C-alpha cells in the first residue's frame, strides 16, 4: 500500500495525473493454497504464523483536496535476513521494516517522537517486537508510538496467533481506521506508514529458499503541506 501511495504521489506531483487510486488487497484462502497448505488438507498452524486478511483498501491521491497530505517518503531496499519459513513472515519482514524506518528518520533528521504513530504492516505480534528490538539496538526507540496493522486488525478474542498479514491487512487498517481518525481529529496528526512485503513465490517457498523482504515508508500529515502540491 505504501508503494502505491508513493508512486501516486510522484505521478500527481509531477503533473502526470490529477487523481490516482492507490489500492491493494489479499485473500486468506488464496494465500494459504499458494504458499502454505490447502485448507482442505486440515493442517495445523504453528504458533508463529499469521492469518492473511481477506480485505482490500484504496486511497485517492490528488493534487488538491482537504484530506491528509503525503509530505515525504522513503523507498526501501531488499533485505534478506535468512528466514526461510513461510509461516514466520513477521520475522522475515521485520529487518526490512527496521532498515526503512532507520533510513527515513536519518534522512529527514526527525526523531521517532515527530510522528504520533509509526504504523507498520503486516509484521504481527512477533514481528512487531522484533522491529522494535532491532531499532533499539541502533539507538532508536519507537515502542511508545509504534503500532502494527497485523496486531490490531483482529480482535484478541479471535485468537489469530500472531495476527493478520497480507497486503489487505495494512490497506484496510490505514484506509478504514487510521485515515478516518486523522480526518475526525482523533489525536493523530502525523503518521509514518511503513507497509512491508515479502518477495517470495510459490516455487521458492516450496524449495525452502530464504525470503527477501522490502518495506517502503510514507509520511502522512493532517496539517502537512507538500512542497510541490499533492494531497492524499
Regions found by a protein language model. Give the residues of each.
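Active-site-proximal alpha-helical scaffold in enzymes
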Residues: 1-22, 61, 165-186
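A generic, well-ordered mixed alpha/beta core segment in the N-terminal half of proteins
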Residues: 1-50
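Acidic, glycine-rich active-site loops and adjacent beta-strand->loop/helix elements
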Residues: 24-33, 76, 195-200, 224
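Condensing-enzyme catalytic core mediating Claisen C-C bond formation in acyl metabolism
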Residues: 41-102, 107-110, 140-152, 157, ...
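Oxyanion-binding "anion nests"
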Residues: 97-131
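Short glycine/threonine-rich loop-to-helix capping motif typified by GTGT followed
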Residues: 123-138, 203-210
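Internal helix-turn-beta structural module
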Residues: 171, 177-207
Amino acid at each position: 500500500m505504501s508503494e502505491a501511495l508513493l508512486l501516486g504521489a510522484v505521478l500527481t506531483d509531477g503533473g502526470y495525473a490529477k487523481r490516482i487510486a492507490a489500492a491493494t488487497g489479499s485473500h486468506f484462502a488464496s494465500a494459504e493454497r499458494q504458499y502454505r497448505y490447502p485448507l482442505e488438507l486440515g493442517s495445523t498452524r504453528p504458533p508463529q504464523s499469521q492469518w492473511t486478511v481477506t480485505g482490500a483498501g484504496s486511497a485517492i491521491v490528488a493534487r488538491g483536496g482537504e484530506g491528509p497530505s503525503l509530505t515525504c517518503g522513503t523507498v526501501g531496499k531488499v533485505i534478506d535476513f535468512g528466514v526461510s519459513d513461510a509461516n514466520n513472515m513477521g520475522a522475515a519482514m521485520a529487518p526490512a521494516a527496521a532498515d526503512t524506518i532507520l533510513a527515513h528518520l536519518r534522512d529527514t533528521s526527525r526523531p521517532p517522537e515527530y510522528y504520533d504513530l509509526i504504523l507498520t504492516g503486516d509484521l504481527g505480534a512477533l514481528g512487531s517486537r522484533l522491529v522494535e528490538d532491532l531499532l533499539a539496538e541502533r539507538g532508536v526507540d519507537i515502542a511508545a508510538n509504534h503500532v502494527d496493522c497485523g496486531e490490531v486488525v483482529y480482535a484478541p478474542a479471535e485468537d489469530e496467533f500472531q495476527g493478520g498479514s497480507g497486503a489487505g491487512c495494512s490497506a484496510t487498517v490505514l484506509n478504514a481506521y487510521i485515515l478516518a481518525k486523522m480526518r475526525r481529529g482523533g489525536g493523530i496528526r502525523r503518521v509514518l506508514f511503513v507497509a512491508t512485503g515479502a518477495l517470495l513465490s510459490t516455487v521458492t517457498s516450496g524449495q525452502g529458499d530464504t525470503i527477501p523482504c522490502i518495506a517502503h515508508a510514507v509520511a502522512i500529515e493532517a496539517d502537512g503541506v507538500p512542497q510541490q502540491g499533492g494531497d492524499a
